[in-house]
Amino acid sequence: MVKSIDIRQLSEAISVEKDNGTKVNYFLYPEFEIHQNVLPANTIQDWHKHQAIEEIIVPTKGNVTIQVLEDNAVRTYTANCGEVLRVKQSIHRIIGDDKEETEFIVFRFVPTGNDQSDKIKNDKVDCEKLVAEILKEK
């Protein structure tokens, strides 16, 4: 078994088809969760919120429209393919395109409140020379 890479097959996902036809494949990890969504055309999710998590939504087919209740008013935002939408702890719902299904990936995590941006930006270590040395020895 490979220790450095963890590839999850679709057969390992928790797959759910909701009453409104939305298909979701959940991949749960100890520190985060990723799920793939297929939202049928003309589908509107129920209003909901999360108690502790935040979500990052990445559209992969079509546009993702989200409505958020802010200051006692409904505000509408749209993220196109290639854009990233961060949903903080808010009352929200996702609205599908009126003509075609929408696909998107959701990354869920529990924010710690700690700024990790420097660690994230500077975490990469160049290993070209190390790998060349290791492979040269064989």
Kindly label every feature range from the protein language model:
Residues 89-117:
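Ligand-binding loop in jelly-roll beta-barrel domains
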